Amino acid sequence: MAKPFFRLQKFLRRTQFLLLFLTAAYLMTGSLLLLQRARVALPQALRAPGSLQALPVATVALGVGLLDSRSLHDPHSSPDLLLDVDTLRSPLARVPPGIRWPRRNRSSLRRRWLHHLTSDPQGPPTLGPEASGPASHNQGNYLGCFSEEGQERTLKGAVFYDLRKMTVSHCQEACAERSYVYAGLEAGAECYCGNRLPATRVSLKECNQECKGEKGSMCGALHRLSVYSVGLQQSGAKKRWTATYRGCFPLPENITRTFSSSMTQANVTVETCSGFCSQKEFPLAILRGWACYCAYPTPQFSLRDAVDGALCSQGTEAQGLPGYCEVYQTPVQDTRCTDRKFLPNKSKVFVALSSFPGAGNTWARHLIEHATGFYTGSYYFDGTLYNKGFKGEKDHWRSRRTICVKTHESGRREIEMFDSAILLIRNPYRSLVAEFNRKCAGHLGYAPDRNWKSKEWPDFVNSYASWWSSHVLDWLKYGKRLLVVHYEELRHSLVPTLREMVAFLNVSVSEERLLCVENNKEGSFRRRGRHPHDQEPFTPEMKDLINGYIRTVDQALRDHNWAGLPREYVPR
């Protein structure tokens, strides 16, 4: 009797160890599969149109703590999953009667918000280099390999990057649209434009990197440019020498000193003058009688004192009164403020550029980078922005090599990591619409009608309206040193507001550089064309909710000795 009992006991002990081993193996395998699925599922999101549905894998991973919360700020999260606003402990944050704060913790709402490459339907496509077409050398002559190692680049008129599908023809077309003569490719993914060839030609073997999207085509190397001429036959290239009318302006006192180049020609036209100035890489073409002048905006000719266009009317041979001139914007970019770099030494002051999503943070970064000459960083990574020239996107956000760091975070711990911050505020009505458009159609697109008419829009407003308010309240409460900037003031009074921002960043900037920024103020991230959704998207209930938050933020700003919100924020 004892022997069978002993055997049974021995078997059960072995079974316990076996079950323990199988359980550990099961948990380890499940964790590895979860991580692998998360990595595979995120790129697949690129192929699907934007919606507000949560990613199950990302949600599970966040719940078990396997993935970094910064990589899972999913813009497509279902509103049912969005956590809500903590009860703010400060007197300034008391909720006025009638405002219903959501019931869950807002930290999850911030965590699920994502500025990641995979969140943007307009991000780089999944098509790899293998699917690209053959090289397009016939669309422009290959001029050779050139060195660009100096501080001052020769080809700097237009710059963009594409880490996944850069081709020779892609760069040529981009330069042709801006009326440049030469297109240079560097490091396999960088495109530069200009009207003058670099001075130093090197061996063809030194341009040994293939284009990221075109096997067999050389796209330069580190500090080496493969330069092509831009052919007029480029498909997709716009008409050359087009110009945009800027207005009628008084002539400066010293024309010769203010206008760098000129020509006189009978029956000179806008296109002729624009072409002449574009070839010389000037952003302004000025017409006065039969004379054509080329110039940059300067303190002596700042384009801020426009007069009635009738004074420059072209009804006579003299073409208007002698003291006035017509000014046109050429397709050529003002290059005096396009040079940017990382900080030479790590910054001692860690500065945030904080805003609610949709408040114009990317546009503000464009202005700051071109004004200071230093890259801005980001708490997130957005491949689309990197491809558009925001090189700081790839730098670690805590590297301190950038002039400031973009963030939409608003928790106490996240705020207190920064020594100071520029707090960018925008009208919540416009911010909500802008962010909804970005979620559904990318940085430059518009959400289709089906999204506005679905349950997604009211759920989005109910979840995000409170975040707009709590974001400002938290930064006012926990921020160590703040500069409050209103988006509307930045747009209406760009140079004075930008000058204040640059001073806050402790950078000295010339007036010419600020005027250059003003001349290039739009950048590449403004939605073009008319909004296709003309109807009022906000219901009376939505307006009541948002208006309550506006009053709360306005009072909080005043309590902290800041001016209140602009008048256009006043409840509708």
From Swiss-Prot:
Catalytic activity: a ganglioside GM1b + 3'-phosphoadenylyl sulfate = an 8-O-sulfo-ganglioside GM1b + adenosine 3',5'-bisphosphate + H(+)
Coiled-coil segments: none
Gene (UniProt): Wscd1
Residues with glycosylation annotation: N105, N254, N345
Main localization category: Golgi
Protein name: Sialate:O-sulfotransferase 1
Stored Gene3D superfamilies: P-loop containing nucleotide triphosphate hydrolases
Protein family (similarity comment): Belongs to the WSCD family.
PROSITE patterns to which the protein is assigned, alphabetical: WSC (PS51212)
Native source species: Rattus norvegicus (Rat)
Disordered: annotated segments: 116-135
Molecular function (Gene Ontology), one example: sulfotransferase activity
Alphabetically ordered keywords of this record: Glycoprotein, Golgi apparatus, Membrane, Repeat, Signal-anchor, Transmembrane, Transmembrane helix
SUPFAM superfamilies, sorted: P-loop containing nucleoside triphosphate hydrolases
Extracellular topological intervals: 36-572
Pfam families: Sulfotransfer_1, WSC
Membrane topology recorded in Swiss-Prot or TrEMBL: Single-pass type II membrane protein
